[in-house]
């Protein structure tokens, strides 16, 4: 019985400075995952076009994100690292999925509603069809797992829906070509060409919030630079931002339950726990009953110790664009070989002549 080979896929848009939330919520975890899993990590520069970036800035951001990957510990000898636009099979499979997915499915995507806002009629078709390309990114490599944040869970569910509909729509053709793979859907054993990709469950650091508003996710689009710690920030800037982080007037609680309803306190304790690879309970054992100034001082030292080596290596790599380009080129060749193998089967399945 054939089964899908375990494979992890994930990607990041090159749209500005990566920050602490990206590192703790994604990249740090990816570094750990590559030790035990086969991984593909992608800089999704095709997705970036949905926000109409300056072309020169997009190329620079693509290199900076790649530099952050490498500086944080992602090893191109262990994992495939590439930028999406080098492998045009992403767009080819996305078109197939555009013909499989239903408009109603896309219309329910909350991220489109959030990004398009009230001016939906002027939003680009690319933004509307973003989840279809995301599904293609994942399924082009027949990835079995994806580390996802809260804001991407709905898109992964759509990816599974698209995979299942493709498998159902073309079930006879898949069987006749002998390219089906056995998998379990609920209690039923079925055969399909694409896997129903599973989310990788993250630890508590998955959602890092703004330093200025604990109810909002840390974001590179926030107009206040004090709201986030960028991976390119120097030691003094990191310390300043943590010192100025918003808190409430009460001291730190001794129990995790005491963080309820206190988003800024919860965020700082969570960041400390994530950077120190411990738990909120352990942090509060040390700082419970003390003032925020004590936690902030220790957190600043910890953040500098953890992030400064990444910052220095990232700057060194950005100064050597030829090396970054070679990493992306080599990764693109590896990814392209896998992608073409998948698409040869997809073309046969849907009936595109290839002779």
Curated annotation (Swiss-Prot):
The keyword Lyase does not apply. GO terms for cellular component: cytosol. One of its GO terms (biological process) is tryptophanyl-tRNA aminoacylation. A motif ('HIGH' region) lies at residues 14-22. It is an enzyme of class 6 (ligase). Its main location: cytoplasm. This is Tryptophan--tRNA ligase.
